[in-house]
Amino acid sequence: MSGVEAEVIRTERLVLVPQRVEHAREMADVLSDPALHTFIGGAPATADELRSRYARMAAGPADPAESWCNWVIRLREGEENPGQGPLTGTVQATISPAVPGESGPGSWLVAEIAWVVGSAFQGRGIASEAARGLVGWLVRHPVRDIAAHVHPGHAASGAVARAAGLEPTDEWHDGEVRWVRRGAR
């Protein structure tokens, strides 16, 4: 395992909370709009399907060199109840060694990130703020290079990637453009 585990991340308006199986019911409602699947495919998951998915995620990857870090995005509701607002979406990072099989001094980690915000919460900068918070958290850990894959027709996700400090490359994967943030070497 890369040794990196999800921790609470706070931003100005959000709290990114490590995802738990118990979040599935509320997240099924948040992610229930079929329009969310326009670029990623599939259909909205039921609460039971999300519970199963979240349980698999919590179990971790088969590759012990990888870490799966998953968060739900919660709105902060005032200073008296920070972190008590509604869930609005998710962010995730798959973290692995930059060179497979290498760890220890001189090695570094890379991360593939993704995000989704429920339709009812879009257009408020939530995805951009969450992605910036995630990238900031990753670079405070030994993660040097960060990448995301964005459908070329999804301008909003491109804007989120750019806001998080990623830049588009000429690389494509499964019909999506690879965006990267390269750290210092």
Language-model regions: role of each:
Residues 1-120, 132-137, 141, 145, ...:
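GNAT-family acyltransferases
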